């Protein structure tokens, strides 16, 4: 089990699309926005390279002024991003998982940005 920086975005966008949301829906949206804000990952980006086996690979490297990212999975207790191979064992550094899973899965995304942007508009609409 985990929190998700990818699947959660569409759920929150759906909730914000509801006309006349109930107090519970508003509370859920506000809670989700706080989570997206506290879960932002800044200062890293993908760098592609050819690994020692001659395969295309990537690693996360520091960067300035790069887009904010969210991890695919966050630990339920610590909110720390984690990654895993097909065995499901949590790893806290993407370089610790195998090439196949690292390159065959979307571990980082920018989807939270559209949620936060839409939230600003939604909040204004709610205050009318």
What feature does the model see in each segment?
Residues 1-2:
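Intrinsic, low-complexity N-terminal interaction/targeting segments
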Residues 6-128:
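Terminal, non-catalytic domain-edge segments
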